[in-house]
């Protein structure tokens, strides 16, 4: 959303709803079939709205589909802006900039890394459960043991 301007935050939410519903209902472009609008950020002066979007793609074809979807969004930018202006009732409608949202893809990568780390932790826990100490379980001398040894030496000397 926007920084500190509550009006910009409200307009960003409105733009997100209008753009998402328009892509789904009014734009009959196959390139936009699997588009999801994830977030909209509006500048505090309400001049520019960055529309972040993501796309569910088929393995191996994501890059090409993403480029085609970006082209379709750029072509529909004027129509979407006029719809936003009409539904929002704004004197000046923000300029729409469509930006591909990298966060979901990065989130999947992080989840994969965490899954590998969890698997390693489980394996380490299994190894640790059957592990034995190389020497004594507690190799350090404690004060009560040192005193007992000291008493033995004193009794030998007497």
From Swiss-Prot:
Answer whether the UniProt record assigns the keyword Cytoplasm to this protein.
yes
Q: Where in the cell is it found?
A: Cytoplasm
| The organism's place on the tree of life at top rank | Bacteria
A GO BP term here is: maturation of SSU-rRNA
Q: Which GO terms describe its cellular component?
A: cytosol
Q: Give the compositionally biased regions (Acidic residues).
A: 145-158
Q: Annotated Gene Ontology MF terms?
A: ribosomal small subunit binding
Q: Where is this region: Disordered?
A: 130-158
Q: Which PROSITE patterns match?
A: RBFA
User: Which keywords does this Swiss-Prot/TrEMBL entry list?
Assistant: Cytoplasm, Ribosome biogenesis
Pfam families noted in UniProt: RBFA
Q: What family does the entry list?
A: Belongs to the RbfA family.
Q: How does it assemble?
A: Monomer. Binds 30S ribosomal subunits, but not 50S ribosomal subunits or 70S ribosomes.
Q: Name the job this protein performs.
A: One of several proteins that assist in the late maturation steps of the functional core of the 30S ribosomal subunit. Associates with free 30S ribosomal subunits (but not with 30S subunits that are part of 70S ribosomes or polysomes). Required for efficient processing of 16S rRNA. May interact with the 5'-terminal helix region of 16S rRNA.
Q: Which PANTHER family match?
A: RIBOSOME-BINDING FACTOR A, CHLOROPLASTIC-RELATED
Q: What is this protein called?
A: Ribosome-binding factor A
**Organism of origin:** Bifidobacterium longum subsp. infantis (strain ATCC 15697 / DSM 20088 / JCM 1222 / NCTC 11817 / S12)
The gene for this chain is rbfA
